[in-house]
């Protein structure tokens, strides 16, 4: 009886030996384990067996998702009851750091774990990125002409051999080397690139400013271009007129082209770099005006097209950081006057506000910082309050000292900027418009500027070693000496109302003469050490010279109109080193007929052929003492030729002067300059004549 009662008691299910007579109670009191959720046996009651099935399926699906995320194959459904194999957390965590015994590193660019062999270590820094990301990075940089390559994570420069190893692309490497070469040649002022299409040949034209006709020596090219304007060669034409002609033809071609639309971008969006001349396109998207050339690395302002520093937009230059055009002259002058007048009031107001703000604001700021420092820490309230009180008390003592030092240093700096930097910056080069008239006091010019910088203006502003920087625009008569070599500009143009512009030795002169008018021009050129700037030319019937700025330009062939009683006198004084020009006295000059005809149909000559010639034939003659109405014209023009090298030059100079004068040349109607009948006094000199080379040449016509 006792054994039966014990077996029927509710505590019998806890015993180690199960009782077959008590199946029901033993089933109800059984323990629930994690293994039983997946492998539960169906009992006689189906309702109880179906309760744990959905929960088991959900847990099984979650486990499969985790396994797929960790890149592990799914485990089979029948999992053993061993707890060491039931939890796969430990083997999966170790697989993230190694794969087959190899160390995995995370790329900072694509955030993908890869073997260490795929992440090369760059020289100079400890950063590592995968090869795929590095190749894409270098490909983008080289395609956009950025050759100053650096590490993607720091500013450490990459060596060319590292770039070659990472790229492993001969075409990109060739382009990279070409961009490096262009960047290097951009610093050479005498480097000229061939303008022919599909030609990347460069010419180092050192000392060719006096003979600007250059020829590309690349095999199959042979293009001729100008040293000054860097465009196709334009014989008997100035650089400005050739540029205008090209612009006109391009505009005409664009208007008739079917692909031309009126919605194309403005020319103001494309400007050349002020250092290397590479064209740069600026998107009209509201970006800043601080530009950086990708070819030469020049930093310049898009509005004024000048190389700038970081303080350019803080100075009163009229250029704004975000604007589309610079300030007008009126706005700059008004801003200057307002600054000069209102500076004391503004500085006093700023100092009056800054002193109490610092005296009150510094203690408040210190107290808040100390309170936030102790807020998250487990410290006593007494210690925190003591630190806050001490910091505020110390800041109250030091705040007046800081305010006094700031005002004592800041106010003189602002006064020096307002009354020193602002006037100097605005009045530099006449930008302030303030001028002093004769007996009229100070005059302020409020005329507006010409407008924004265009492509043509930007090209004219390029720094070039050419001797000619003068413009041929306008019809004002006078002598322009804007070239660095102080050259001569002579223009015996039409003797009527229409001026003629011809450039010689670096300048431009528009001669406008009327009835009984007289023109006298005298120019001087000092000898320089540079061979290209030691030569002067006074016109020749050859097309072997650019007439832009023109040391070594030509005078175009023309016929003087028949004007009654008009005399023209030109005096030329050139001081230079001895050249191959040889002049004799007036008795040695014979009147050949060849000198009377203009040099038409001559073959163009390059620099070498130009230097080999000693005297160029004159295109026309103006006989001294003969009136133009009688149709007798004779001229004697001398042209010192280019000197080959500094070794062939002599430091001695001669004082010989060849003069062709007449006592009657000053009269409106000269009959003759000599007692004998007038004769032509100009002939082509023989290059073989061993005559003395003069230094000073004075010509009277």
Curated annotation (Swiss-Prot):
Protein name (Swiss-Prot/TrEMBL): E3 ubiquitin-protein ligase RNF19B
InterPro entries referenced in this protein's UniProt entry, alphabetically: E3_UB_ligase_RBR, IBR_dom, TRIAD_supradom, Znf_RING, Znf_RING/FYVE/PHD
Name of the encoding gene: rnf19b
Binding residues for Zn(2+) 4: 273, 276, 293, 296
Residue span of region TRIAD supradomain: 103-323
Database matches in Pfam families: IBR
Residues holding Zn(2+) 1: 107, 110, 130, 133
Top-level EC class as recorded in UniProt: transferase
UniProt organism field: Danio rerio
């Amino acid at each position: 009886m006792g054994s039966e009662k014990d077996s029927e008691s509710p505590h019998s299910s806890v015993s180690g030996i199960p009782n077959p007579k008590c199946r029901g109670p033993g089933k109800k009191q059984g323990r629930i384990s994690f293994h039983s959720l997946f492998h539960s046996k169906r009992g006689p009651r189906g309702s109880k067996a179906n309760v744990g099935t959905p929960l088991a399926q959900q847990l099984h699906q979650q486990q499969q998702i985790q396994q797929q995320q960790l890149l592990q194959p799914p485990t089979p459904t029948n999992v053993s009851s061993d707890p060491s194999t039931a939890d796969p957390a430990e083997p999966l965590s170790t697989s993230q750091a190694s794969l087959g015994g190899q160390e995995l590193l995370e790329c900072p660019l694509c955030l993908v774990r890869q073997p260490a062999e795929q992440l090369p270590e760059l020289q100079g820094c400890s950063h590592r990125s995968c090869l795929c990301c590095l190749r894409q990075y270098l490909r983008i940089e080289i395609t956009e002409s950025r050759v100053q390559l650096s590490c993607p994570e720091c500013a450490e420069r990459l060596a060319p051999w590292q770039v070659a190893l990472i790229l492993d692309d001969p075409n990109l490497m060739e382009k990279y080397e070409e961009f490096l070469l262009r960047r290097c040649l951009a610093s050479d002022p005498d480097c000229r690139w061939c303008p022919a299409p599909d030609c990347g040949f460069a010419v180092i034209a050192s000392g060719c400013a006096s003979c600007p006709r250059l020829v590309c020596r690349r095999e199959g090219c042979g293009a001729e271009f100008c040293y000054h304007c860097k465009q196709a060669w334009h014989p008997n034409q100035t650089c400005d007129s050739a540029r205008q002609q090209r612009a006109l033809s391009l505009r005409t071609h664009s208007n008739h082209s079917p692909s031309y639309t009126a919605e194309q971008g403005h020319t103001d969006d494309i400007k050349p770099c002020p250092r290397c001349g590479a064209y740069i396109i600026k998107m009209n998207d509201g970006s800043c005006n601080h530009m950086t050339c990708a070819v030469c690395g020049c930093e310049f302002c898009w509005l004024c097209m000048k190389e700038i520093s970081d303080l350019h937009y803080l100075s009163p230059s009229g250029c704004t950081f975000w604007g589309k055009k610079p300030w007008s002259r009126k706005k700059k002058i008004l801003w200057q006057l307002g600054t000069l007048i209102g500076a004391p009031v503004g500085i006093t107001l700023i100092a009056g506000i800054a002193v109490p703000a610092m005296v009150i604001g510094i203690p408040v700021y210190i107290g808040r910082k100390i309170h936030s420092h102790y807020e998250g820490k487990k410290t006593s309230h007494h210690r925190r309050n003591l630190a806050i009180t001490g910091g505020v008390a110390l800041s109250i003592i030091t705040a007046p000292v800081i305010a006094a030092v700031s005002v004592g240093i800041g106010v003189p700096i602002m006064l020096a900027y307002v009354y020193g930097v602002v006037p100097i910056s605005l009045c530099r080069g006449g930008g302030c418009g303030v001028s002093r008239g004769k007996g009229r006091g100070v005059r302020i010019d409020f005329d507006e500027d010409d407008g924004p910088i265009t492509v043509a203006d930007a090209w004219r502003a390029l720094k070039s070693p050419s001797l000619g920087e003068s413009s041929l625009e306008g019809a004002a008569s006078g002598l322009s000496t804007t070239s660095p070599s102080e050259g001569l500009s002579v223009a015996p143009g039409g003797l009527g109302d229409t001026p003629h512009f011809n450039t010689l030795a670096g300048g431009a002169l528009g001669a406008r003469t009327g009835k009984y008018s007289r023109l006298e021009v005298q120019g001087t050129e000092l000898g320089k050490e540079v061979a290209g700037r030691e030569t002067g030319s006074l016109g020749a019937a050859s097309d072997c010279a650019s007439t832009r700025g023109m040391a070594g330009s030509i005078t175009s062939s023309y016929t003087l109109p028949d004007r009654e009683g008009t005399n023209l006198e030109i005096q030329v004084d050139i001081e230079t080193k001895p050249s191959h020009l040889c002049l004799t006295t007036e008795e040695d000059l014979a009147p050949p007929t060849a000198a009377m005809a203009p040099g038409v149909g001559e073959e163009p000559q390059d620099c070498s052929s130009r230097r080999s010639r000693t005297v160029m034939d004159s295109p026309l003659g103006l006989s001294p003492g003969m009136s133009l109405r009688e149709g007798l014209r004779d001229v004697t023009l001398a042209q010192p030729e280019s000197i080959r090298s500094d070794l062939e030059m002599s430091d001695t100079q001669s004082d010989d002067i060849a003069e062709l004068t007449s006592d009657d040349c000053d009269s409106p109607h000269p009959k003759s300059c000599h007692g004998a009948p007038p004769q032509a006094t100009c002939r082509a000199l023989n290059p073989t004549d061993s005559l003395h080379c003069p230094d000073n040449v004075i010509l009277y016509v």
